[in-house]
């Protein structure tokens, strides 16, 4: 019984224990109860081979290699010697292939020691219970996985503040080229968000929402190592890992910055291709906007020369600025600064002409007064003709009275009357009408 306890608590595996004994010890002193049947058969085979060669069998040749058990020497964590990842933690391509892996929903579902990669992500048993972060921490699952029907059996011994994992998360694809890293890191960030680790992802300002734990850092390092092999990483990622091979957070932060830069580049190109200017805004503001866009594109590796920039600017000119297309298109060596000198000249000329014009604006009341004065000029014509008619009517009455009383008046009066009747009557009007006596 004492030998059984020693064999159970020994840090060395049974295979190595059997390999360390000689053939003589196997036949004479070995207790068959100390090891299993399979180990006994291995020891007997090793002893038979040792007897035939008359030499002691080394441990490395006696025990067959077991790929699912790591020796104590390889289970330790060391700094990387060559490459961004430690050689002890690297996996073969068959082990890293996610096609045969089970989908998982939380870092604690993967049983491994810190900073050491397990041979495989073995699926947990049906009775296994794994803790999960509460809903207030991290990012919830955004979309259900196609394999969401597979669930774990609940256990009554779970803590009150922990819930069992009910959904699996699809792992990201394998990185196969350095050029695919920008697209791959997007899927990897989505994978972390679906794994309730959205809070540790750096935001726009480069800082995460919450502090990452040691277990989460281990999960981050291991998954990044498996899905992004070192030979397919870009140069800038290898430079970061060469300083600290566990600094995955810095890689994510730099990747997010590059994503934002790519988005800004696309927006700048669209803005530069759709420029419009007609003098409605100050020329200084328009020049600042265009030069800032060109400088950003040049700094990000998208070089815009003077010829292309001038063509894009002139294509968006309208109004009085449109003629610059025809006066400057023959100048092959024209720069953006020279083009903006012409734009400034036209803008200043427009502002000067606007300032020279009177700013007086006629009020509606003035227009009403003008209309009233116009009507008053026509009315005197009507009013001037009416008194004439009344005066003529009075003169007619007076003359008729004189005619009726002509018999009693002297002859001189008759002569004057007859003389006055033969003379034309002058009307004080504009038309200078001459009325004969027959019209009365």
From Swiss-Prot:
Q: What is this protein called?
A: Transposon Ty1-PR1 Gag polyprotein
Q: Name one GO cellular component term.
A: cytoplasm
Q: PTM Phosphoserine: list the residues.
A: 416
Species this protein is from:
Saccharomyces cerevisiae (strain ATCC 204508 / S288c)
Question: Where are the stretches annotated RNA-binding?
Answer: 299-401
Induction entry: Ty1-PR1 is a highly expressed element. Induced under amino acid starvation conditions by GCN4.
Chief subcellular site? Answer: cytoplasm
Subcellular locations according to the entry: Cytoplasm
- State one molecular function term (GO): RNA binding
> InterPro entries under this entry?
TYA (IPR015820)
Q: What is known of its domains?
A: The C-terminal RNA-binding region of CA is sufficient for all its nucleocapsid-like chaperone activities.
Asked whether the keyword Nuclease is assigned, the reply is no
Q: Where is the composition biased (Low complexity)?
A: 153-165, 402-418
What interactions and quaternary structure are annotated? Homotrimer.
Show the ranges annotated as biased composition (Basic and acidic residues).
429-440
Keywords from the UniProt entry: Cytoplasm, Phosphoprotein, RNA-binding, Transposable element
- Gene Ontology biological-process entries: viral translational frameshifting
Q: Where is the composition biased (Polar residues)?
A: 1-23, 48-60, 71-93, 127-152, 419-428
Q: Where is this site: Cleavage?
A: 401-402
Look up the further comments and give them.
Answer: Retrotransposons are mobile genetic entities that are able to replicate via an RNA intermediate and a reverse transcription step. In contrast to retroviruses, retrotransposons are non-infectious, lack an envelope and remain intracellular. Ty1 retrotransposons belong to the copia elements (pseudoviridae).
Q: Which domain of life is it from?
A: Eukaryota
**What is the protein's known function?**
Capsid protein (CA) is the structural component of the virus-like particle (VLP), forming the shell that encapsulates the retrotransposons dimeric RNA genome. The particles are assembled from trimer-clustered units and there are holes in the capsid shells that allow for the diffusion of macromolecules. CA also has nucleocapsid-like chaperone activity, promoting primer tRNA(i)-Met annealing to the multipartite primer-binding site (PBS), dimerization of Ty1 RNA and initiation of reverse transcription.
Q: Where is this region: Disordered?
A: 1-93, 126-173, 352-440
């Amino acid at each position: 019984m004492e030998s059984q306890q020693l064999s159970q608590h020994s840090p060395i595996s049974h295979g190595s224990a059997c390999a360390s004994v000689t053939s003589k010890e196997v036949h004479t002193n070995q207790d068959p109860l100390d090891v299993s049947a399979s180990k006994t058969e291995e020891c007997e085979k090793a002893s038979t081979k040792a007897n035939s060669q008359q030499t002691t069998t080394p441990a490395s040749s006696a025990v067959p290699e077991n790929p699912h058990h790591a020796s104590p020497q390889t289970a330790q964590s060391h700094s990387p010697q060559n490459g961004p990842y430690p050689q002890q933690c690297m996996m073969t391509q068959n082990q890293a292939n996610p096609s045969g892996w089970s989908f998982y929903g939380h870092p604690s579902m993967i049983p491994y020691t810190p900073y050491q990669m397990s041979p495989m992500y073995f699926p947990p048993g049906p009775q296994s219970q794994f803790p999960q972060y509460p809903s207030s921490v991290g990012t919830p699952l955004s979309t259900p996985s196609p394999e969401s029907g597979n669930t774990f059996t609940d256990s009554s011994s779970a803590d009150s503040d922990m819930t069992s994992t009910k959904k699996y998360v699809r792992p990201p694809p394998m990185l196969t080229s350095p050029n695919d890293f920008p697209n791959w890191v997007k899927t990897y960030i989505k994978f972390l968000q679906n794994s309730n680790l959205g809070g540790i992802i750096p935001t726009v300002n480069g800082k995460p929402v919450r502090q990452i734990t040691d277990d989460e850092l281990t999960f981050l390092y291991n998954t990044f190592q498996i899905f992004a092999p070192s030979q397919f990483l870009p140069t800038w990622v290898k430079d970061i890992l060469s300083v600290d091979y566990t600094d995955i957070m810095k890689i994510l932060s730099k990747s997010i910055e590059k994503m934002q830069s790519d988005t800004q580049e696309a927006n700048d190109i669209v803005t530069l291709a759709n420029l419009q200017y007609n003098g409605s805004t100050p020329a200084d503001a328009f020049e600042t906007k265009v030069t800032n866009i060109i400088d950003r594109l040049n700094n990000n590796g998208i070089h815009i020369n003077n010829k292309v920039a001038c063509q894009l600017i002139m294509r968006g000119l309208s109004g009085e600025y449109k003629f610059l297309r025809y006066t400057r298109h023959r100048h092959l060596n024209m720069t953006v600064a020279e083009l903006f000198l012409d734009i400034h000249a036209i803008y200043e000329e427009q502002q000067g002409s606007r300032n020279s014009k009177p700013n007086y604006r006629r009020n509606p009341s003035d227009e009403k007064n003008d209309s009233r004065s116009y009507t008053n000029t026509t009315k005197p014509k009507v009013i001037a003709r009416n008194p004439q008619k009344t005066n003529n009517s009075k003169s007619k009455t007076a003359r008729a009275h004189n005619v009726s009383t002509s018999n009693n008046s002297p002859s001189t009066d008759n002569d004057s009357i007859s003389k006055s009747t033969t003379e034309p009557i002058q009307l004080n009007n504009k038309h200078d009408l001459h009325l004969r006596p027959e019209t009365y």
